[in-house]
Amino acid sequence: SEASPEVNQYTSKFDAYLAGQATLTPEEEDGLEVFRGKGLCAACHVLDPQENGEPALFTDYTFDNLGVPKNPENPVYDIDPGFVDLGLGGFLATRPDEYGQFVAENIGKQKVPTLRNVDLRPGNGFTKAYMHNGYFKTLEGVVNFYNTRDVKPACPDPLTTEADALAQGCWPAPEVAQNVNTDGLRNLCLTPMEEAALVAFMKTLSDGYFEP
């Protein structure tokens, strides 16, 4: 589970900062403030300690549809070009007798993940993938999507990669159009410096900063 020591050891720079054993850089501090406030990040990636007293896991365990585009690099499209990941709603639909009444409102919703170790990598040059389908390959792209999803125009090609979308100043259409969250994502009006600060802060969540 997300709370297990194999997944989260709570040995990040942020944990050391909370314990008074490390100091965040000015950029990291700015990112924490954006995370708590203007960026609306903490609404879902909560900063509160767990009920058992352990540090925050940066998730509220809810489900959301963020309007993430299809990942054109997903090999499933070689087999089924029409494949759509319906998320929680798709699962509930497999048990209509038990959960049928909840299907429609949960189509496209995916579980809010922990942000701990969001930038932890096994080695230099390792490319991470973010969101439920791996569409994003950079935290910078993720943050820019949160900030500008409802501002930038739609890309002409719904299978545009993150890199091409950033270069073109557009975002592809959502993989699932139903139930897209318009509260936590909109025009957040973050500046480029605030976006960069958010990324810098999230990089403080990687375990291994100190020995447990």
Predicted regions and their residues:
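Periplasmic c-type cytochrome electron-transfer domains
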Residues: 1-212
